[in-house]
Amino acid sequence: MVSVQSNDNESIDKMLKRFKKKYERAGVLKEFRKKAYFLKPSVDNRLKRSRGKRRAQRANEERNS
């Protein structure tokens, strides 16, 4: 559970910004989207491999550029 305590003389905007940062770092939304539907382990592994290949290709292209 992500929570934020208000500091002295802190505006709501700054508090909201701190909350959003903590929320993103905690990975709440990412985990929610991942658990929204079931993926077979074989499909999940296949997707992870393909994402890794794409990431490696991009890194390789950046090194060569």
Swiss-Prot record:
Annotated InterPro entries: Ribosomal_bS21, Ribosomal_bS21_sf
Keyword field: Ribonucleoprotein, Ribosomal protein
Pfam families, per database record: Ribosomal_S21 (PF01165)
Keyword match Ribosomal protein: yes
GO molecular function, one term: structural constituent of ribosome
Region (Disordered): 43-65
GO BP term (any one): translation
Compositional bias segments (type: Basic residues): 48-57
Tagged with keyword Oxidoreductase: no
GO cellular component: ribonucleoprotein complex; ribosome
Gene3D superfamilies (UniProt xref): Ribosomal protein S8 (1.20.5.1150)
Similarity comment text for this entry: Belongs to the bacterial ribosomal protein bS21 family.
Protein name: Small ribosomal subunit protein bS21
Organism encoding this protein: Chlorobium phaeobacteroides (strain BS1)
Species classification: Bacteria, Pseudomonadati, Chlorobiota, Chlorobiia, Chlorobiales
Name of the gene encoding the protein in the UniProt record: rpsU
